[in-house]
């Protein structure tokens, strides 16, 4: 066997292998950055181009999220990618500004996700109150709070060097001074106080809020789906019972088991959607923030507890930034945005126009169960076919009639929010945009 004569670089890897690894890293990171840029740019362009997307207050939060993720792709990811490929930080004193941008943009992205979850919970739990109070001004206030908090925990501590810890051990094991290490790697070791406090504000508190809100959303949606299914069965049952034979005898009414299966299918879709939202977010950011709180407590050697090698830490960092490339897919891929994207990309006629059978079930203040169903080809204007079934009041008591005459809700519908509309897409996944509040007249608010 011929002796191995390949040269080794400073990392101990063969030069050929190190070069190939750098090429693969460059390709992967370039694709990640480009996908993040494309996705979030499309969201921003769609909102600027199409007025109906700007008319929905909920989309204000999606826009803010897209802007924060776009800034991650412009101000944060490219600089770190160059450093990863080069093997050192080539931008000198820009390190501190870059660190501040990193903290600000990442925090803004996470806080915007938190605001979206609170907005959806409020819209579903208190639709009448949401419709009155969630104005564009209120939305701008929430967005301003998220961005202000992101700036406060990033630029001020970084510029005043409050975030730095006194060095106890080198990250690469061979530097002679803190300044030289930061100039070469831009790997500033955070102080324990700043690491914990910033992690609480940037991740742990928001993720706790998101878990509570999305769990509550699922419970509300589950109850609404079951009650609406019961009302569907009651409406069909009442309609069938009014059918008579030629002899004037009523036809025997029967209940179908398909409604129970449909109810289970709807609940499963809602659960799957919420699981994807939380699962992607937690999987992307949790490893980084766990390690971010562990590293400051690391001892003088990397082999001690709480110590994480620099390669693993960098992988966790990129996992977190990858969330910015996935957010447009999760939060902006409803029917409205899909049509806008198709138009912007010029594939309005080339994209497949699969039919989406959509059924809208809403209940107005008069106790009427409204079913709106239509087949909506992508890129076309939907044509609704509305069927209104009024639950017969004869099944209620005289107290129910008094409630109706007084403008109230019949007792069987009392626990069901009269302003909640659940839109169920049988061919596509359920999204949070498909659970919308409606006005007093039973019409969907925009």
Swiss-Prot record:
Glycosylation sites recorded in the entry for this protein = 4
* Location(s) in or outside the cell: Cell membrane; Endoplasmic reticulum membrane; Cell projection, Cilium membrane; Cell projection, Dendrite
One of the GO biological process terms: regulation of dopamine metabolic process
- Identify where the record puts lipid attachment of type S-palmitoyl cysteine: 347, 351
In terms of superkingdom, the source organism counts as: Eukaryota
Q: Phosphoserine occurs at which residues?
A: 441
- InterPro entries membership: Dopamine_D1_rcpt, Dopamine_rcpt, GPCR_Rhodpsn, GPCR_Rhodpsn_7TM
Q: Give one Pfam family, short name only.
A: 7tm_1
Q: Which residues lie on this side of the membrane: Extracellular?
A: 1-22, 87-95, 163-192, 300-312
Asked if the Swiss-Prot or TrEMBL record annotates the protein with the keyword ATP-binding, the reply is no
**Disulfide pairs?**
95-186
Its keywords, alphabetically, are: Cell membrane, Cell projection, Disulfide bond, Endoplasmic reticulum, G-protein coupled receptor, Glycoprotein, Lipoprotein, Membrane, Palmitate, Phosphoprotein, Receptor, Synapse, Transducer, Transmembrane, Transmembrane helix
Task: Please give one Gene Ontology molecular function term for this protein.
Answer: G protein-coupled receptor activity
Provide the topology term for how it sits in the membrane.
Answer: Multi-pass membrane protein
What GO cellular component term, any one, is given?
plasma membrane
Residue intervals on the Cytoplasmic side: 49-59, 119-137, 219-272, 338-446
Entry's transmembrane regions: 23-48, 60-86, 96-118, 138-162, 193-218, 273-299, 313-337
Q: Which family does it belong to?
A: Belongs to the G-protein coupled receptor 1 family.
So what does this one do? Dopamine receptor whose activity is mediated by G proteins which activate adenylyl cyclase.
Q: Subunit structure, per the record?
A: Interacts with DNAJC14 via its C-terminus. Interacts with DRD2. Interacts with DORIP1.
Name used for this protein in its record: D(1A) dopamine receptor
